[in-house]
């Protein structure tokens, strides 16, 4: 399958979808989670965290699915690490971390 799906390729945009755990309802996914600037960061090959260029979106609207889009610049690494940490207090959703190993 061609970009932006699998396999994740170095220097090519990449899209993946996740569901976040609802912090107030253990064992449940959070429907329509609130996503704010600064919640989502990316690290390339251990070089340091930066905000994602494109804020993740709930897609389809009102669902549990969060669409994460990484640009070709953000995918310019052998190891890409994405983290999501809700900055609100109390937290709405549980922290998230994902490592992506790219191919050439």
Model-derived features with residue positions:
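Polar, enzyme-active/binding microenvironments
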Residues: 1-104
């Amino acid at each position: 399958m061609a970009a932006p799906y699998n396999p994740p390729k170095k220097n090519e945009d990449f899209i993946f979808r996740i569901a976040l755990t609802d912090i107030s309802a253990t064992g449940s996914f959070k429907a329509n989670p609130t996503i704010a600037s600064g919640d989502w960061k990316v690290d390339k090959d251990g070089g340091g965290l930066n905000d994602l260029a494109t804020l993740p979106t709930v897609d389809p609207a009102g669902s549990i699915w969060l669409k994460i889009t990484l640009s070709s610049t953000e995918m310019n690494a052998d190891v890409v690490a994405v983290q999501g940490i809700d900055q609100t207090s109390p937290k709405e959703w549980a922290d998230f971390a994902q490592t992506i190993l790219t191919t050439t």
